[in-house]
Amino acid sequence: MKGGKRAQQPAKQNAHRLNGEIIGVKEVRLTGLDGESVGVVSLNEALDVALTAGVDLVEISPNAEPPVCRVMDYGKFLFEKAKAAKEQKKKQKQVQTKEIKFRPGTDIGDYQVKLRNLTGFLEEGNKVKVTIRFRGREMAHQNIGVDVLNRLKADTEEFAVVESFPTRIEGRQMIMVLAPKKK
């Protein structure tokens, strides 16, 4: 890459202190590999237990008296934690707002196609913003736009809830927001 230097990012600090990093304490409350409590032991004893097991001594709660340490494979622990966070993120559904535009003179065929798309969006769990756009002399017949919105409201009442219904026209359009019903 030509040009400037890339900024060096500092190495990530571990959230927990490991093996030789645990200093300033003489005794620790030790938890074994399978989660059972060993009791209060000296720091050197705890390090020996971790060394003989071939894993790490990890300081879990440094503020406790005495500090709580656990014998575990730290790399595996971090991997499991990252895997759990990834699973949690995957389960979290991102709700999007889709928009469908109508005109006061939208014919029945176009209306049916747009209604089918709208129901598809709602079944996916997305919110739908329905916009009625007015042009020219259509502004004088706003009641036709309200009729279209009421018809949509009636056609989608079994699987959608109206979040906001327009009380008046905003600029040259009316906007209604539909949300999927909770199952």
UniProtKB/Swiss-Prot annotation:
Leader sequence residues: none
GO BP: any one term: ribosome disassembly
Keyword Cytoplasm found: yes
Record's subcellular location: Cytoplasm
Gene Ontology CC entries for this record: cytosol; membrane
Functional note: IF-3 binds to the 30S ribosomal subunit and shifts the equilibrium between 70S ribosomes and their 50S and 30S subunits in favor of the free subunits, thus enhancing the availability of 30S subunits on which protein synthesis initiation begins.
Complex formation: Monomer.
Family label: Belongs to the IF-3 family.
Name of protein: Translation initiation factor IF-3
Organism: Aliivibrio salmonicida (strain LFI1238)
Gene name tied to this protein: infC
